[in-house]
Amino acid sequence: MSPSVEVTPAHTPTSYEVTNSLDSYRGYDHVHWYVGNAKQAASFYITRMGFSPIAYKGLETGSRDVTTHVVGNGQVRFAFSSALRTGEPQADEIHAHLVKHGDAVKDVAFEVDNVEQLFSAAVKKGVRVISEPKVLKDAHGSVTYAVISTYGDTTHTLIERGSYEGAFLPGFVDTSANKDPIAAFLPNIELMHIDHCVGNQDWNEMDNACKYYEETLGFHRFWSVDDKDICTEFSALKSVVMASPNEKIKMPVNEPAVGKKKSQIEEYIDFYDGPGIQHIALRTDCILDTVRDLRARGVEFISVPGSYYENMKERLAKSSLKLEEKFEDIQALNILIDFDEGGYLLQLFTKPLMDRPTVFIEIIQRRNFEGFGAGNFKSLFEAIEREQAKRGNL
């Protein structure tokens, strides 16, 4: 039976008075992708990345124009939407997005304490509105949401879940009982949550994007590096990490810098046809197991040269830091290390998940370290440049 959904406007103050609610972010809610085949995209993350079915909306639930499959792992939730036909606004929007960008992230949703108050404050400060607050209701309760624009065609949905008890959102049916039989034959993958989502900008657009987050959403500059820190023989980039007031959400923003050849950021902009989400970092508590098991499932990661580990071993020997993991295991899995005297992170990046060299996934583990792998950027860039060269895009 199709779920019954009621949609009503929320009671947003018409005066849009500034409130102190720009600090009400609870964290990432989900990442929404527009793809050509939502069923197959969801299946990829189930079989390759170890996600599980969460919820579904489509013809069987009364959604005649768009279908959405939701999958998750830990607190990570990805929603994949595809158009079922043309001639309806959202379906046509998905078609247009696919033609321009290919399969890609459309929306990064934030869970907040109070949508109406945060939206009011953001509108007063000049946020670009896509959809004013609305309330969705079904038998499991209600959810309030609003949608705002960020860079390019990317949006942020603000979601207030309250005491909602459904699997995902009103209008979806629970699919958590639909276990994929192949899971019994594959290693289990344990992820925690989304650590950060990175957006790429075109030339000289990073500052504008950062100012937008600062001025409208109350974010602040958490961390930054310039082209002197992130460069190779051939290319360079600049990066600023924007964080919500409580630092539960971090959105790094990149732009290309002048180099001898085309950088990975320029390649992304060329094939994505504009600014957008470059990668999503997924946090794990044991990256050795996670990467080993993802490789066993067929996930392809970038390669790191042996010289990186020779240099890293020398750096570690000169510091007081002690790794909990065996260095040999880290090297065997091609995992990158960054550290200071207080802690360290371990990270590794997949190859692009699409035929277009656009979106990829990062697997990250933190041990008392809140940086973003600046010490790895040169090695990472060189590894990505090797892949670019194979594609004829360097």
From Swiss-Prot:
Keywords: Dioxygenase, Iron, Metal-binding, Oxidoreductase, Phenylalanine catabolism, Repeat, Tyrosine catabolism. Pathway: Amino-acid degradation; L-phenylalanine degradation; acetoacetate and fumarate from L-phenylalanine: step 3/6. Fe cation binds at residues 196, 279, 362. Its EC number is 1.13.11.27. GO terms for molecular function: 4-hydroxyphenylpyruvate dioxygenase activity; metal ion binding. One of its GO terms (biological process) is L-phenylalanine catabolic process. InterPro entries: 4OHPhenylPyrv_dOase, 4OHPhenylPyrv_dOase_C, 4OHPhenylPyrv_dOase_N, Glyas_Bleomycin-R_OHBP_Dase, Glyas_Fos-R_dOase_dom, VOC. Binds 1 Fe cation per subunit. Residues 27-161, 193-351 form the VOC domain. It catalyses: 3-(4-hydroxyphenyl)pyruvate + O2 = homogentisate + CO2. Its cofactor is Fe cation. Belongs to the 4HPPD family. PANTHER family: 4-HYDROXYPHENYLPYRUVATE DIOXYGENASE. This is 4-hydroxyphenylpyruvate dioxygenase. It comes from Yarrowia lipolytica (strain CLIB 122 / E 150).
